[in-house]
């Protein structure tokens, strides 16, 4: 975040940004910052060839969390979330990213920043697939066989009894 962006946001959201202006200047100016939907936009708008986040690129428009939720499928209630990292989790006005194993990455506000939280600790009501992300089904790694030198040698079988 630079001075120009902060000034734009102060005009755009005076009641939300203005009360935190000093904190933002002291802690976030000169660094990367994101609100909840900004985490998703930052990933979707990222240009790997330049290393930049290019506004409204890669097919994703500049939308808010509720618009994204209301305009996509598949989605479901939070109790049906599949174990797919990268899904979004949502409740009205807020969105986070499910990273698997019951964990979420979310932007929790100006003073807290971006944090990892437990899925069960949030007020999440639904999950969605983000249409600008390609989900790849993971295949489990095959188990490696036990090395031969660690196997116990088998006892030799007793000889067959000899008949007279």
Where is each model-derived feature located?
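Loop/turn positions that initiate beta-strands
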Residues: 85-87
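Long, low-complexity repeat tracts used as extracellular stalks/passenger repeats
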Residues: 161-164
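Aromatic- and glycine-rich peptidoglycan recognition patches
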Residues: 49-83, 92-159
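N-terminal capping segments
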Residues: 1-52, 92-94, 105-107
